[in-house]
Swiss-Prot record:
Coiled coil: 553-614
Keywords assigned by UniProt, alphabetized: Coiled coil, Leucine-rich repeat, Repeat
Protein name, entry field: Leucine-rich repeat and IQ domain-containing protein 3
IQ domain: residues covered: 215-244
PROSITE patterns: IQ, LRR
InterPro entries in the record: Leu-rich_rpt, LRR-IQ_domain_protein, LRR_dom_sf
PANTHER family: LEUCINE-RICH REPEAT AND IQ DOMAIN-CONTAINING PROTEIN 3
Domain LRRCT positions: 132-179
Start and stop residues of the LRR repeats: 51-72, 73-94, 98-119
Gene designation: LRRIQ3
Keyword DNA repair belongs to the record: no
């Protein structure tokens, strides 16, 4: 509708005012939310998601789950790997009536009392609490299993009957936490999962838990056996009763009618009752899954009533004078021309028996018309071909004829009764003619009634056609008016859109010119500023250079002064060292002279002593 960049003027338009409200309204339709490992701390945004069914908030920093109170349609809730330390009260869990799977493992729960509030959850099937501090407490599993009644699985194991029923010691197969009861219903999360996949996963987990319980729960196994026994016990009289009733019906109709079975149920019953050696369970299972009704039963019964109303008038009033010759056999594949009004089909076991109508010569002439009517009211549908057992052709009982001939024989008591026989034949023929006339009259009445019905049907069809055409014309006119209104609204909308677009483009061009002027001024100001900055930079550089040169000169002067000072200090130091050296040399010489004097004196003393010693010790004879 708008072209160009979205600006503040567009976002403040009245058509954009409900944008945020629409977003909030759209959150009500969310059914699947998955925020895994996003370091979230709050769930406040889920308060408006009232249609949420699957919620995955694992591996975050969630501490409060009260915002989920409005999500009453939750089926699966995954909160593992968070920092939850306490659960809401029973009112919160009582509102989650559809919650089946709850994942709370790897959290900070520490008290069993706080966990017991989950007993208010009415449909909770599977729960995980492992890797929590509370799972290390003694009796943790016993308390949870006996507090949450609908619970079927807890922490990778399905709940056994030994954990529920007190003081019941079972074999190893049915004990708690057996390997047969192991089921990991919290697999690792996969990326890109959809809502349908999550729902299918929930169904798979539920069915798997039920299957494990069905095969490893003694209570359920015994219940299944008892139900099977009761069902077989209740159904056995039905089978025996139906078999006896079938035999009675067969014996009763062996001398009267040949019945035709229609429908898949009758074929099944015929196989069950006539062939006892067949597989009854297989037949029942096949009938259960493959039963087929090609036409609506109620509609078929209503259609048959129209035909039966015409055929009922073809029957003679005196039922006692029905001719046995009108009863004929129906071969395989042949269908009766008209049928008696059908009763509503019952889904229970029964044998369908249809009586054959009686026809006269007049009624058989209109066979094609009746067949067309039958095809109109009973459309042809593909039906399975049923096997009919051939029946022996019933022969006419001629005992009465034989007795009449014997009575009218001339040998009877020597009396000729030929005249009476002729009179009796005359009256018989007269009755037959009257009976035939009555039948012709009934057929004529039926034809008149059929013609009347045909005219009424045609009138009804014409009225329906006229009403339909009138309704179609009215609908066309309404559609045309609606289309004109739609086109007019669209034209008005386009005009308003064009006006708004022109106004928007005008404002846009004006703002573009203003923006260009501002840009030119900014460019000139920028150039001036750059020149001033360049001059300031040059002046600063010159000042810096002068300062640096001055510093260098001062450093050179200081260096020269330092060198001269070092030279003078070296000279003074050398003089002092020389003077000290001379003094030390004089002192050393004096010390050496004193030592030499002392040595000389010692030597003189020793010499004197030696001399004195020699004077006393030398014998006189040795002295010259």
């Amino acid at each position: 509708m708008f072209h160009g960049t979205v600006t503040e003027e567009l976002t403040s338009h009245e058509e954009w005012s409900h944008y945020n409200e629409n977003i909030r309204e759209g959150q009500k339709d969310f059914v699947f939310v998955k925020f895994n490992g996003l370091h979230l701390k709050s769930m406040e945004n889920l308060q408006s998601c009232i249609s949420l069914r699957v919620c995955i908030f694992s591996n975050n920093f969630i501490t409060d789950i009260h915002p989920l109170q409005s999500c009453i349609k939750l089926i699966k809730l995954d909160l593992h790997g968070n920092q939850i330390k306490s659960l809401p009260n029973t009112k919160f869990w009582n509102g989650l009536k559809n919650l089946k799977l709850l994942y709370l493992h790897d959290n900070g729960f520490a008290k069993l009392k706080n966990i017991c509030v989950l007993s208010a959850c009415p449909t909770l099937i599977a729960l995980t609490m492992f890797d929590c501090p509370v799972s290390l407490k003694k009796g943790y599993r016993h308390v949870l299993v006996n507090s949450i009644w609908p619970l079927k699985a807890l922490d990778h194991h399905v709940i056994s009957d030994e954990e529920i029923i007190q003081n019941w010691h079972l074999p190893e197969r049915f004990k708690a936490c057996n390997h047969r009861l192991f089921f990991n219903f919290c697999p690792a999360l996969r990326k890109g999962t959809t809502y349908e996949e999550e729902i299918n996963n929930i169904k798979h987990i539920t069915s798997k838990i039920n299957a494990i319980l069905a095969h490893n729960s003694p209570v359920l196994i015994v219940q299944r056996w008892i139900r099977g026994f009761l069902v077989r016990k209740n159904l056995s009289p039905v089978f025996f009763h139906k078999k006896k009733q079938q035999e009675k019906i067969i014996r009763g109709y062996e001398a009267k009618w040949i019945y035709i079975t229609k429908g898949y149920e009758d074929k099944l019953l015929k196989d069950l009752f006539f062939k006892p050696e067949t597989n009854i369970k297989g037949k029942l299972a096949y009938w259960k899954h493959n039963i087929y009704y090609p036409v609506d039963l109620k509609n078929s019964s209503e259609h048959r009533k129209h035909v039966s109303s015409i055929l009922c008038e073809l029957k003679p009033k005196d039922l006692g004078m029905k001719s046995k010759t009108s009863r004929h056999l129906i071969q395989k594949g042949q269908e009766s021309e008209d049928e008696i009004v059908d009763e509503k089909l019952d889904t229970s076991f029964r044998i369908s028996v249809f009586k054959l109508p009686i026809y006269t010569s007049g009624s058989l002439k209109n066979n094609a018309v009746l067949r067309e009517k039958k095809q109109h009211f009973f459309p042809a549908y593909p039906q399975p071909i049923y096997t009919t057992h051939p029946k022996p052709i019933i022969k006419k009982d001629i005992r009465l004829e034989r007795s009449m001939k014997e009575f009218f024989a001339p040998q009877r008591a020597g009396m000729k009764l030929r005249t009476f026989s002729d009179i009796d034949k005359y009256y018989t023929e007269q009755k037959k003619q009257e009976y035939h006339k009555e039948k012709v009259r009934v057929v004529a009445m039926a034809q008149v009634a059929r013609e009347r019905v045909r005219v009424a049907v045609n009138e009804h069809l014409n009225q329906k056609k006229y009403a339909t055409q009138k309704l179609i014309e009215e609908n066309k006119e309404t559609i045309q008016n609606s289309l004109r209104q739609v086109w007019q609204n669209r034209f008005n909308y386009l005009e308003k859109a064009r006006e708004r677009k022109a106004l928007f483009l005008k404002e846009k061009s004006q703002k573009a010119s203003e923006r260009l002027l501002v840009q030119n001024l900014n460019n000139e100001r920028t150039l001036l500023t750059r020149g001033l900055l360049k001059i300031d930079r040059l002046e600063k550089n010159e000042a810096v250079l002068k300062e640096k040169s001055l510093i260098v000169k001062q450093k050179l002067k200081a260096e020269k002064y330092r060198k001269n000072l070092l030279k003078e200090m070296k000279k003074v130091r050398s003089q002092e060292i020389y003077k000290r050296h001379c003094e030390e040399k004089f002192v050393m010489d004096m010390i050496a002279f004193e030592k030499a004097c002392e040595r000389l004196q010692d030597a003189k003393t020793k010499v004197a002593i030696v001399k004195t010693n020699l004077d006393f010790k030398v014998p006189n004879g040795l002295i010259k």
